[in-house]
A protein has these predicted regions:
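Surface-exposed loop and turn segments in beta-propeller and other repeat-based domains
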Residues: 137-152, 201-220, 263-284, 328-359, ...
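Boundary at the C-terminal end of the N-terminal hydrophobic targeting segment
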Residues: 23-25
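Beta-propeller blade signature
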Residues: 184-194, 248-264, 319-320
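Bacterial N-terminal signal peptides that target proteins for export
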Residues: 2-13
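Conserved blade-ending motifs and adjacent loop-strand segments that build the rim/top face
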Residues: 288, 401-423
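Bacterial N-terminal signal peptides
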Residues: 11-21
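Repeat-solenoid scaffold signature
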Residues: 279-320
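Acidic, Gly/Ser/Thr-rich repeat motifs that build Ca2+-stabilized beta-propeller blades
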Residues: 30-36, 40-243, 293, 302-309, ...
């Protein structure tokens, strides 16, 4: 796609002219280079069904805590500890509940004064400030310029790297459009804490195309990760699209991709497909599914992503420019009816393997690398929230490989939506229902 046509699209975003019929008409043409495979059956996201009970993991030092058979009966990892890494307990911790009065919280950001900026996902979507004592503000004003409350869903929120100077916050949201369509957007605004409002709210990016879904909040992606230069990385979910849209493998749409844009919403200058005909210039990588975590490792600078698999095959991926992460051609999971997806293969030349995968699934949501000093035992750790797993999973990394695993917070039996490491070195966790938790050393 030429840069001019991208700017035309951006101009439409900036004007907030969200025209559902136009978006719905933007069905992508098939990519002739994309391998063909049978599309998975559309079904609820793993973890959405609370009727199943996730068994308590066994905690035996040096042995995997997962003992159930994999969903894909003949599945075998392609290298040691690609799945079911040995259990290792690293540190004792204390859990403090800051508040249990939130409504479907989705993301945490840390304000310089020690307060928390938290998104509540939907019904209606809201942005709130939570004080250290647990008091919760009224919804931040200014979001009604984006969409009506019953059509708006908030996802991630992140402070501009220069927030101390410009008070700007970036956030992602989705909007319910007509006829069952929805879409994912990136916006920013200037936060006035005293007034409890966002000003100068501007949409900078709209994923294309809008997509029909049974549940308008399904597989939106939406996490934000800032690069050192201030540009934004953002996953866009595949939106559960089946035949004939093998969208994650097609390069004329944003679905099933990691995108990389400037703070103005333009394609970043170092993107791998910037001048390639037929490829959206914002694309950084392709072939991902329903990504609910994206973060940079502060030690290596490497970008990591987590995504939901189907039945089995949740993934932790090391994201590199121009790479294809394989969905739905390869997967360590199976389709929801219990049959193979496509050819039922887990590897293919030219397609990236996950660094780690979970089978059965944990339904991962939220990704954070430990970078504090409160828990020296957690150095080299990355945390992954588990919705269906009802735990906070700690993975220990060495040379970009998982060498140990430790499920935390299993005693709470809570679906974990987000995890962040605070400026104080404590680990902060959102449960899907209503709680903000703080983990400190015991």
């Amino acid at each position: 796609m030429a840069r001019q046509s991208f700017k035309t699209r951006l101009a439409g975003v900036a004007s907030l002219a969200l025209i559902p019929t136009l978006l719905a008409a933007q069905t992508p043409a098939p990519n002739p280079e994309a391998p063909k495979t049978a599309a998975p059956v559309r079904a609820p996201e793993p973890g959405a069904d609370d009727s199943s009970v996730f068994p308590a993991p066994q905690m035996v030092e040096g042995l995997p805590f997962e003992t159930r058979p994999p969903e894909k009966a003949d599945d075998k990892p392609l290298f040691p500890q690609q799945t079911r890494a040995p259990y290792h307990k690293a540190a004792d911790y204390t859990v403090t509940t800051i508040t249990n009065k939130l409504h479907l919280p989705w993301c945490i950001a840390f304000l310089p004064d020690g307060k928390f900026l938290i998104t509540e996902k939907e019904n209606p979507g809201a942005l709130r400030i939570v004080d250290k004592d647990g008091s919760i503000s009224a919804p931040i004003a200014g979001l009604t310029t984006l969409a009506a409350p019953d059509k708006l869903g908030l996802l991630d929120v992140a402070l501009d790297p220069n927030f101390a100077r410009n008070k700007r916050v970036f956030f992602t949201f989705f909007e319910r459009l007509q006829d069952g369509y929805s879409n994912t957007y990136v916006a920013h605004g200037v936060l006035d804490e005293t007034a409890g409002a966002l000003y100068e709210v501007t949409v900078i990016f709209r994923a294309i195309p809008a997509a029909p879904v049974k549940n308008f909040s399904m597989k939106q992606g939406g996490r934000i990760a800032f690069a050192k230069d201030g540009s934004l990385f953002l996953p866009i979910g595949d939106r559960d699209q089946g035949t004939p849209w093998m969208v994650a493998q097609q390069t004329d749409n944003d679905l099933g991709k990691i995108i990389h844009i400037t703070q103005d919403g333009l394609p970043a200058a170092n993107n791998p497909y910037l001048h390639k005909p037929g490829v959206l210039p914002e694309i950084w990588s392709i072939g991902t599914r329903s990504q609910e975590g994206l973060a940079f490792d502060p030690k290596t600078g490497h970008l990591w992503e987590i995504e939901h698999g189907p039945r089995g095959g949740d993934e932790l991926n090391l994201i590199k420019p121009g790479k294809n992460y394989g969905w739905p051609i390869i997967t360590h999971g199976i389709d929801y009816p219990g049959v193979p997806i496509g050819e039922g293969i887990t590897a293919k030349e030219g397609l990236e393997q996950p660094v780690y995968y979970w089978d059965p699934v944990i339904a991962p949501s939220g990704l954070a690398f430990y970078k504090g000093n409160l828990f020296p035992q957690w150095k080299n750790s990355v945390f992954v929230g588990g919705l269906r797993g009802r735990m906070l999973d700690r993975l220990e990394l060495k040379n970009d490989k998982v060498v140990a695993e430790e499920p935390l917070l299993t005693e709470l039996h809570s679906r974990i939506r987000d995890v962040r490491v605070g400026p104080d070195g404590a680990v902060y966790v959102l449960t899907e229902s209503d709680r903000l938790l703080k983990l400190t050393p015991k």
